[in-house]
Amino acid sequence: KYQTRLNMVQPQAYSSVEGIKLEKGSYISIIGKAEDSTYWDEIAKGAEDAVKALNEQLGYEGKDKIKVTYNGPSHEGDVDEQINILDEELDRYPAALAIAPIDRTACEVQFDLATENDIPIVEFDSGSDYQGIMAKVMTNNKEAGMTAADKMASLIDEQGEVLLFVQDNKSTSAQDRESGIKGQIQAHYPQIQISGTYYMDDLEELKKMTAEKLTEKNKANGSEEEVTADSVTEEQVMAQILEQHPNAKGCIATSGEVTEK
C-alpha cells in the first residue's frame, strides 16, 4: 500500500533522470519525518534508485558519483531533532536538499540560510509557508481526507460516532487531511459525529492520562498499585480511548504510520 502512495506522485516526482545535470561528486540531502518506518524506508530507497540512475546516465564512477543520504528523527514527529538534522546537513553544503517538514513554520531560519547559500529546497509529503521553495511534491491531502470521510460514511451507513486519529497537529499534510475529513462530514453527513480527535504527537500526554485512569481503576478494585506513564503501552492508550467512546462505530487514521501505532 505504501508503494501505491508513492506511485501516485511518480509522474511529478521521479520517472526519468534524462536531461538532469549535476557536477561530479555532488551531494544531495533528503530529510524525512522519521528515521525508520515502512513509508520512510520507501522514500529513502526511491532517492537511492534515482541517484543510481543519474550516475549511470552521466557516466559518473568512483569518487565522481553523486551521493544521497536520507535522515530523519529517531522518534517520528520530533520537530527539534529534525531541525538539528537540517542544521547539520546545511553545514555540509549539499547541492540540493529535500525535506518533509514536521512543523510548517519551524524551519524558516534554516531555509533563509539555504537560500543565502544557493541551496535549492524541495518539499515533499508536507509543506511549509516559506516562499522560497523550489518545488513541492505531495498528495492532495485535503482531497485524500474527503475520500476517507466518504469511505467511512459508506461503512457505517452515514450515521453514528467516529474517532479521528491524526499523525500530528503541526504539518500541512496532517492539517489538510484533518480539514478534508471534518469538512466533508460536516457538509454531507449530518448524522455522523466526530466524538474525539487525537494527535499522535500528543502520545506522551495520552499515556499520562491513561496511567491516571488505570491507577483509579486499581484503587477502585482495592489495589494501591500506581501505574506510571512510562509503563503504559500504545495498545492501552487505544483501549482507554475506546472505553471513553463506547458508541464509536469507526476510526479514521490520517496516515499509515498512525495505523501502526
Regions found by a protein language model. Give the residues of each.
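A residue-level marker of the well-folded mature domains of exported/periplasmic proteins
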Residues: 1-261
